[in-house]
Amino acid sequence: MAFINLLILIILTLSSTPITTMSIPETNRRNATTNSYTDVALSARKGAFPPPRKLGEYSTNSTDYNLICKTCKRLSERNTCCFNYSCVDVSTNRFNCGSCGLVCNLGTRCCGGICVDIQKDNGNCGKCSNVCSPGQKCSFGFCDYA
């Protein structure tokens, strides 16, 4: 009971105490939140990449899109596609399988840039590149399913 009384006393004391804020002069405000390393990194970044965006927000600026695509192709050795402001691998992406915008049908998966039914394909049984032994048949994603 004493603990509860003490807790109530602390809450009442804190709630009646005025809150003071410390103001930073306008000239020093920028320096209070950044440092020279951040400034250098941000100034270098502005020339190389588009500004950061909120999650789920896309830019309507075609320059941003072209920059993402060029960066994507430059950094990746695989076949890539610039799709929805991101870089995708066309050898494994089911929404861009083999080429940009080619969507695999429901129940199929993109394996090596080709849409395959992994439930029936002997060369991609259950997952990409899972080859059934000679004489075995892929059924329901398993080699020689009984």
From Swiss-Prot:
Localization annotation: Secreted
A Pfam family it matches: Stig1
Glycan attachment residues as annotated in the record: 31, 61, 84
Recorded GO CC terms: extracellular region
Tissue: Expressed exclusively in the stigmatic secretory zone.
Cleavable signal peptide: 1-23
Keywords assigned by UniProt, alphabetized: Glycoprotein, Secreted, Signal
Post-translational modification: Glycosylated.
Disruption phenotype: No visible phenotype. Increased exudate production by the mature stigmas, but no effects on pollen tube germination, pollen tube growth or seed set.
UniProt KW Transmembrane helix keyword: no
Major site of localization recorded for this protein: secreted
Source domain of life: Eukaryota
Record's function text: Involved in the temporal regulation of the exudate secretion onto the stigma.
Family: Belongs to the STIG1 family.
Protein name: Protein STIG1
